[in-house]
Amino acid sequence: FREKSILAGILVLCLIVLLPIGYRFIQNEKEAQQSMDEVLVNAFLDLDESITEDRAKVKALCTNYNSKEFRTLCMKLPQKYLYKTEIIEEIAAYDYSRYGDYDLPDLFSFFVGLEHKAQQNTLTQEDAENLLSLFDLWKSCNWNRVTAERFSQDPQIKEMIREMNSAIERYEMLEY
């Protein structure tokens, strides 16, 4: 009986020590996820701001196509969007099960493809229209209502990203 009492006492002491440690670990994990959600939301909102600006330019170019202006715009796309898409990619890689659906490598690759075509001077009005349709897809999401608290539960964002990636794949298949 005495050995069982000692064993029970040790077990209780272990629980007393481990429970606060476990609780703190869970709190740290929640805080880390909350911070990543906030960084991810800010990256998407920065991306939205840039896309809104570029969408207006591309829309004007689709109406009044100017190959020189479109070429200049396309030459700047990868550099302009690299940092924003890298942040999203890093967070998605950190916790793929939670953030993998938000990764945008296809969008960045599409921008690089447009830059490559601009360097070769082979851009067409169809490229401008494809870019505009991607930007329109992006704007179909109501970014004004996005917050860190609701971001990961918002199916509209994931669906919009899936649609964009599918559209990019279709455009790339047209190229080859």
Q: What positions do the PLM features span?
A:
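Alpha-helical segments in soluble extracytoplasmic regions
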Residues: E53-A118, N130-S166
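Ser/Thr-centered flexible coil motifs
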Residues: N121-A128
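Amphipathic, heptad-repeat alpha-helices with coiled-coil/zipper character that mediate oligomerization
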Residues: N42-S50, S97-D103, T124
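Extended, compositionally biased alpha-helical segments that mediate assembly or anchoring
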Residues: A167-Y176
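Immediate post-signal-peptide N-terminus of mature secreted/exported proteins
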Residues: R24-C74
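Hydrophobic membrane-insertion alpha-helices, especially the h-region
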Residues: I6-G22
